[in-house]
Amino acid sequence: MSDFAYPLHEECGVFGIYDRAGTEDVAAAAYSALYALQHRGQESCGIAVNDDGVITGHRDLGLVNEVFTPEVLASLSTTTAHMATGHVRYATAGTRVRANAQPMIVRHGRGTMALCHNGNLTNAVELRRQLENEGAIFHGSSDTEVICYLITRNRLRMGSIETAISKTMDVLEGAYSLVIMSATKLIAVRDPRGYRPLCIGTLPGGGYVFASESCALDATGAALLRDVEPGEIVVVDTKTGELRSIKDHCGRPDTQMCVFEFIYFARPDSVIEGSSVHEARKQAGRFLAQEHPVEADVVIGVPDSGLDAALGYSQESGIPYGIGFIKNKYIGRTFIQGSQKQRENSVRIKLNVVSSTVKGKRVVLVDDSIVRGTTSARIIKLLRDAGAKEVHFRVSAPPFKYPCYFGTDIPDQKLLVATGRNVEQINEIIGADTLGYLSTEHVVQLAKNAKCGFCTACFTGEYAVEPESVLSTDIHDRHLNDRPKDAKKLGE
């Protein structure tokens, strides 16, 4: 879900539920699911409910528990509502506007639609320009609104919403996992390359759940059925209660699942494409120990996404695993903060070293990535200040050298510490004794059970979809100029 008003990208979480038995409070179920998906987006959230064909909703800036007070949640809860959708969103500073929050609800001549989107269109600028030339008026800066316009336009010309979605997919490029709710249908859609995860669950009393991750199914009592396949449209018709799959409407390019889902974004208790995220991260640690062995006394991980890889490194190397940091639970993830200054400030209060674990010891420190380098340097300094004799940094991903255009907040190349630098030069910046990255050869082997290929463009620069359209266009420049005057680019 990209923002034209700010040239960075975001990660989000989507959810949808249809309760056939009519025994669930679907608004409360969506609330629980969004709690489980909160790690995917912390700037805004929303829920839309379908009460006998009438769709209403609430969305705003803030965390799930901030936006959905007991009073707000009660206003959405009715005994006759059997469908709901939900969304959590992350975006960059300068785009924190309510208009970009989701679900987006569209009312048109043939009904109402609520839409949730995770991903980023690479041709959204061109599509938006075409729509504006045809008279469309946009209220926000999100490419999700482009998708809403296109589906609505096609719906007015076609006999069903799924046909309109299929027609819309013909012109969309890039990453999109969608959950869409109409008066009588709940629909899940995944782009043909399957960049972003999307799964299907079944409710005990009958009905279905769609979610970005299986951890949201667990939160609602649903059982994981399967993943939505790349290019697939899954339709739940509430008139029949049946689930229907549409697969023959688009081409079948090679799957490009974002490998960063396994490395960092997803919760470790989730299962994606048949593979446990927890096990995939442990496998990354085992590969790291094979590729970059070192003599040390203890292996520690950076909470939270570095812990599983550290455990794998310990198991493979035989070096004892230890708890090296205590994490402040009340501060967000540094990678998902609005500005570079916010990131730096949050590191200072986010982690505290368990000195008894590291004092006087040779430490293997495992983390999931190095993007800008500021967080890594600060963490290494914390360990040295606590008495660590040596710090050997191991990273469970290859170096980030290129920006992402498919829904991950990785900035342009000039802000990436690995751009134009080799491993030794990066290590000089972060201050470790040694530095080792996971190889691109092994990173695509993390999820052994996954029957899909992976996108590694942020490591290799090899994009399955050319990203030129999001880099330099008149409409992009115009929206940049129209952003709030107090909005600053990352790193300013």
Task: Set out the residue ranges of the language-model regions.
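Short, glycine/charge-rich flexible loops or terminal/linker lids adjacent to PRPP-binding catalytic cores
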Residues: 318-363, 374, 401-407
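Generic beta-strand/beta-sheet core signal
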Residues: 116, 181, 189-190, 201, ...
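Flexible loop/turn segments at secondary-structure boundaries
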Residues: 92-93, 123, 187, 195-196, ...
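Conserved short alpha-helical segments that host acidic/polar catalytic motifs at enzyme active sites
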Residues: 1-230, 235-238, 242-296, 302, ...
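A conserved beta-strand->alpha-helix junction
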Residues: 140, 145-148, 321-332, 429-447
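Secondary-structure transition/capping motifs at alpha-helix termini
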Residues: 136, 157-158, 293-297, 315-322, ...
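PRPP-dependent phosphoribosyltransferase catalytic core
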Residues: 169, 184, 221-227, 381-492
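Phosphate/diphosphate-binding loops
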Residues: 167, 215-216, 220-224, 231-232, ...
